[in-house]
Design a protein with these regions (language model features):
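The feature marks short-to-medium sequence segments in extracytoplasmic or secretory-pathway proteins
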Residues: 46-84
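Short, surface-exposed ligand- or partner-binding patches at beta-edge/loop junctions that are enriched
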Residues: 98-123
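Asparagine-centered strand-capping/turn motif at beta-strand->loop junctions
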Residues: 33-40
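Short Pro-Gly-centered flexible turn/kink motifs
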Residues: 81-95
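Short, solvent-exposed loop/turn segments enriched in Ser/Thr/Gly
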Residues: 26-32, 106-109
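Acidic, serine/threonine- and proline-rich intrinsically disordered appendage/tail regions
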Residues: 121-152
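Low-complexity, acidic Ser/Thr/Pro/Gly-rich terminal tails and inter-domain linkers that flank the onset
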Residues: 1-25
Length: 152
């Protein structure tokens, strides 16, 4: 009766959240949010992280999209269940468009904040997200968590 123990969902204490590799190709930009299991047991993630950029009184929330602009992520039918052994990482890609003459958010520099799927702790992962005419202008999107690493 001592069979394998089913993995439990990752909790706040199980995860280290950080910014990962980014790419730039005008006007599309992308960056990864990395989730690393720092716990002592296997856990799972599934779904979309919460992602927002806070600039003064403006908060720009990322829209959840299954497959992004870039077309280089796995074609998904639904968000996968990602199993993380201790020390393993998964990621989600944030994508946005730079200004190409359309109306933009108010110009400023903000903080990217993220919350892992099905958890409650929000973490600031970047202090230099530019919005408005010189930065994130529209179409801020977040893709679901997938296993592995992005862009390396």
């Amino acid at each position: 009766m001592g069979g394998p123990v089913a993995a439990v969902p990752c909790g706040n204490a199980d995860l280290q959240i950080s910014s990962g590799y980014g790419t730039q190709s005008q006007p599309l930009q992308a960056s990864a949010v990395v989730f690393t299991n720092i716990g002592d047991h296997t856990c799972t993630l599934q779904g979309y992280p919460g992602v927002a950029i806070a600039v003064d009184k403006t908060v720009v929330n990322a829209a959840r999209v299954l497959n992004g602009f870039r077309g280089d992520l796995p074609a998904l039918g639904s968000p996968p269940l990602v199993t993380l052994v201790p020390g393993a990482s998964a990621y989600a890609v944030i994508e946005w468009m730079l200004s190409d003459g359309q109306s933009c958010y108010p110009t400023g520099t903000g903080i990217i904040e993220t919350t892992a799927p099905n958890t409650t702790r929000t973490v600031a992962i970047s202090g230099g997200a530019h919005v408005g005419r010189q930065g994130i202008c529209s179409s801020l999107e977040i893709n679901p968590v997938v296993p592995g690493t992005f862009g390396t």
